Amino acid sequence: MKPKSNKQFPSQKSAENRVYLKFTSHLNETEFRNRCKENEYWYHSYYFDNGFVQRGDYDIGQDFEGYQFPSELSGMSILDIGTGSGWFATYFEQQGADVTVTDVRGYCDFDLFGRDRYPNVSTEKPAPERKLADGREIYYSPVSQGFWVMKDILGLKAQYYNARAYDICPELFGDKKFDLVFMGSLLMHLRDPIGALMAAHSVCKHMLIATTYMLPDHSPLNEPIMKMRENAGDGISWWIPTQACIAQWLLAAGFKTFNIDNHVRLTTDSPYKHPITEKSTGVSQTQQLIHAYV
């Protein structure tokens, strides 16, 4: 998809295959930028078809084709687990999908490596940020606040639920299951990736798409092993598996068939400092692409 306007904006990068999101708001550029300033941390970059840009850690639109989503998303029910700033949820909805997203209440729910190293992360329940029409109290961390800013700006209808990856179950969504379950760059940040995949499987009617780090193919015999990323330095990274290990994760979670032979590029755009570690978060990387089926 190409931008509708030929006007060039200084922060807009040129990319032949870039995916531009639709700007469905009445806000002018100044109003848009002022609303975006309400959020201090953007995990995803937003490049719109009218030239408006909000830059974040990662520019998904530049490498979107690598995820190999179904070509037709209209009418599908999609669950985006760990939506972050909500780029994928926005794209899914603009393609006609029925979108549900989840994210944690705050950093108190993150799987932190050495939690006592981060005294600023409270273990207490945070104050709710808002209430929904059905009375549910909603909480969000700086990572997911961007979703709410864009939801308000664009008028998105995506349903939001507070939940850790391990808490996903049909009962959370009124016994609903989803045609497609998406877990983008999440598994490496979890202590128990198998448990999270089991939870995802419980609400998956057809297909799971996920990405994660993987040990090189030349790892010893490509045995089903995983390495702890104790030296990652970001406080939220845990495991790097071999390809054989990813296969065992998926089988253990209940998926019957899968393809884990492809990769996706995650490109840094405008790195922010992580709100927990205060280190720059954006590092371009190649991740293993997982397509799994129930």
Regions found by a protein language model. Give the residues of each.
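N-terminal, positively charged/glycine-rich alpha-helical extensions of SAM-dependent methyltransferases
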Residues: 2-48
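Conserved alpha-helix/loop element of class I SAM-dependent methyltransferases that forms part
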Residues: 53-75
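Short, conserved loop/helix-junction motifs that constitute active-site signature segments
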Residues: 73, 92, 200-203
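Conserved class I S-adenosyl-L-methionine
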Residues: 76-84, 100
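Residues at the starts of beta-strands that form the adenosine-phosphate
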Residues: 77, 97-98, 206-207
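Receiver (REC) domain switch-region micro-motif
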Residues: 78, 181, 186
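Class I SAM-dependent methyltransferase SAM/SAH-binding core
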Residues: 87-168
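S-adenosyl-L-methionine-dependent methyltransferase catalytic module, highlighting the catalytic core
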Residues: 136-144, 166-173, 178, 182, ...
